[in-house]
């Protein structure tokens, strides 16, 4: 193929003109906006999360046959209660109660229409997530650490890996429930950095 120098030069100049003179600078808005979950009257988000998590934990312990009436159960129940209170404190201090409430609502909806898969990843170390039905693994029974998921001294955000069999069906269900101005698919911008940073 023969090239005409003027044609090549003209193509380069036009590409430069398009790239630097016609395209605007664009910086994506990287502000994190957590979901805004409406809680029932008489509650703030922290109190409502505590109520739901406590009720969920009570149901789980009851199903396991752990009651205050059995002497052996008392210390184990105490361990569960201490862990739940610690996690709720960290979640509230970090301002993530509405995130957990939103994930519970999504989990409840996916279970209702049989789209749910297991919650996975480091969120399985959260007793709050287990008590809310977001994950199906008992973190105390299996020795999983909440601190691998969320810590009070960290700056990262909680990330609950929640798989569903048909994400587009779930999106449509949530739009019907919450409105199309509040439900949008999102994408990740993956970056690599050292874990210690």
Language-model-detected regions and their locations in the chain:
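Phosphodiester-processing cores and adjacent nucleic acid-binding clamps
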Residues: 1-197
């Amino acid at each position: 193929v023969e090239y005409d120098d003027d044609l090549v030069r003209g193509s380069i100049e036009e590409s430069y003109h398009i790239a630097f003179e016609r395209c605007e600078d664009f910086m994506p808005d990287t502000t994190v906006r957590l979901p805004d979950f409406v809680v029932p009257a008489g509650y703030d988000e922290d109190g409502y999360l505590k109520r739901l998590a406590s009720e969920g934990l009570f149901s789980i312990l009851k199903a396991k046959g752990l009651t205050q009436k059995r002497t052996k159960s008392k210390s184990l129940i105490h361990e569960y209660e201490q862990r739940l209170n610690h996690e709720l404190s960290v979640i509230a201090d970090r301002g993530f109660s509405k995130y957990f409430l939103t994930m519970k609502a999504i989990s409840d909806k996916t279970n209702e229409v049989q789209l749910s898969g297991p919650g996975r990843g480091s969120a399985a170390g959260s007793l709050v997530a287990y008590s809310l039905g977001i994950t199906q693994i008992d973190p105390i029974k299996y020795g999983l650490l909440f601190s691998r998921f969320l810590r009070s001294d960290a700056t990262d955000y909680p990330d609950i890996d929640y798989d569903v069999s048909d994400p587009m069906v779930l999106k449509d269900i949530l739009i019907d429930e919450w409105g199309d101005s509040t439900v949008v698919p999102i994408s990740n911008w993956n970056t690599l950095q050292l874990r210690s940073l």
